[in-house]
Amino acid sequence: MKFVDEASILVVAGDGGNGCVSFRREKYIPKGGPDGGDGGDGGDVWMEADENLNTLIDYRFEKSFRAERGQNGASRDCTGKRGKDVTIKVPVGTRVIDQGTGETMGDMTKHGQRLLVAKGGWHGLGNTRFKSSVNRTPRQKTNGTPGDKRELLLELMLLADVGMLGMPNAGKSTFIRAVSAAKPKVADYPFTTLVPSLGVVRMDNEKSFVVADIPGLIEGAAEGAGLGIRFLKHLERCRVLLHLIDIDPIDGTDPVENARIIISELEKYSQDLAAKPRWLVFNKIDLLDKAEAEEKAKAIAEALGWEDKYYLISAASGLGVKDLCWDVMTFIIENPVVQAEEAKQPEKVEFMWDDYHRQQLEEIAEEDDEDWDDDWDEDDEEGVEFIYKR
């Protein structure tokens, strides 16, 4: 199935049902009084994370989702039926952004997590609500309010412990094939990897971690060169980045300059991502003698001002790969995800009609009961007064 990590959709919650103006008419019961019921609330639109999904391709074709409208109230104090909700299932790791305001509504990071993205309209009030000691036959009602309408941007970001960085043909796909069951395409030309891929590295029966491979970066990626930097978002949730450097590029390019390009493009994309722990890994050492590879790696590290530990591996032959994976596993165990950060959610999203009923009833209560019919007009349609403010 084609990997799609972005989609725009329209969500529309259901409108609230209108209140009813009705009076009890029954034999032997004179002046039965008002019995108009309230309308039903409009249906909501929800997002739900599903671990069985891994792409947003479905929302490239189906772009509009509408919840059901609440039914109108009826006589005999019958309340209208609430509109049915709509649930949109998305892959775990999806970020939901309101395109109108630019705010992040939420990150779907756990299976089964639900997020309210459009709230249904409030129900209208029937005339029974407006009965008082001085107004025995109220002809007021309120209409239901419109449901929320939002244009949303869905961004799928892979959930991985380890992210891989490097120039095209640095050996990232070969590495992930060597350490996991993932089988990304491997070839001797640049940009073999066109979409991100995940691999699970199992160290033993109880220990494992997830590694993400993204397409390679080239100079000018921030300006759109190559495949650009849009895939870097898939590394935002990684705990450590493995920066793979081809120690002896076949095209004759300078490994030091290649490494600096990656660092530069990383900083252009996000300072937070650039600040993540990053390990230097020299790949393809099987192409050189051991002493020559060590000497060249040391020279590159010094040119980059790198003072931390670095690794020499050959993803093709497996040399040094196991030691690197165990060190990564140890780092992940010693640096667990902070629960507070993992569950971090944006500020409360405001919906249009949150305080509608409270405000309406407060305004009505403040009116002088003796003047309830001052604005009465015999020409009103069906003798009904509508109370509705938007």
From Swiss-Prot:
Q: Which GO terms describe its biological process?
A: ribosome biogenesis
Binding residue positions for Mg(2+)? S173, T193
Q: Which SUPFAM superfamilies match?
A: Obg GTP-binding protein N-terminal domain, P-loop containing nucleoside triphosphate hydrolases
GO molecular function annotation:
GTP binding; GTPase activity; magnesium ion binding
Where does the protein end up? Cytoplasm
List the PROSITE patterns. Answer: G_OBG (PS51710), GTP1_OBG (PS00905), OBG (PS51883)
Cofactor entry: Mg(2+)
Entry keyword GTP-binding: yes
Q: Which InterPro entries match?
A: G_OBG, GTP-bd, GTP-bd_Obg/CgtA, GTP1-OBG_CS, GTP1_OBG_dom, GTP1_OBG_dom_sf, OBG_GTPase, P-loop_NTPase
Keywords attached to this entry: Cytoplasm, GTP-binding, Hydrolase, Magnesium, Metal-binding, Nucleotide-binding
* Binding-site residues, GTP: 166-173, 191-195, 213-216, 283-286, 314-316
Which GO cellular component terms, listed alphabetically, does the Swiss-Prot or TrEMBL entry include? cytoplasm
Any one Pfam family match given in the protein's UniProt record, by short name: MMR_HSR1
**What sequence ranges are listed for the domain OBG-type G?**
160-333
Q: What Gene3D superfamilies does the database record attribute to this sequence? A: GTP1/OBG domain, P-loop containing nucleotide triphosphate hydrolases
Quote the biased-composition stretches of kind Polar residues, using this chain's numbering.
Answer: 129-145
Q: Which residues form the signal peptide?
A: none
Q: How does it assemble?
A: Monomer.
Task: Family membership, please give it.
Answer: Belongs to the TRAFAC class OBG-HflX-like GTPase superfamily. OBG GTPase family.
Q: What is this protein called?
A: GTPase Obg
Q: Which organism is it from?
A: Escherichia coli O139:H28 (strain E24377A / ETEC)
Classification of source organism: Bacteria, Pseudomonadati, Pseudomonadota, Gammaproteobacteria, Enterobacterales
What gene, per UniProt, encodes this protein? obg
